[in-house]
């Protein structure tokens, strides 16, 4: 089985891992209530998705 001839340096390792990161979720305003919500998901504040009420949200 092959083994590395040289040790991987900190710089090379960190440069390789530079693209491994978390991405921010795609937020968009809800067309019904205007609150920010995750795209392609039901709005947690009003319960609407695609112009229809999907879940019943109790108003506080």
From Swiss-Prot:
Similarity-based family: Belongs to the bacterial ribosomal protein bL32 family.
Keywords for the protein's UniProt record, in alphabetical order: Ribonucleoprotein, Ribosomal protein
GO terms (BP aspect): translation
Pfam families: Ribosomal_L32p
Identification of the protein by name: Large ribosomal subunit protein bL32
Biological source species: Pediococcus pentosaceus (strain ATCC 25745 / CCUG 21536 / LMG 10740 / 183-1w)
Cystine pairings recorded for this chain: none
Gene Ontology cellular component annotations, sorted alphabetically: large ribosomal subunit
């Amino acid at each position: 089985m092959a083994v590395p001839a040289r040790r991987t340096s900190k710089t090379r390792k960190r440069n390789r891992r530079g693209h491994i990161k978390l991405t921010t979720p795609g937020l968009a305003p809800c067309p019904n209530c205007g609150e920010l919500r995750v795209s392609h998901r039901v709005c947690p504040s009003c319960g609407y998705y695609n112009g229809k009420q999907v879940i019943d949200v109790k108003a506080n």
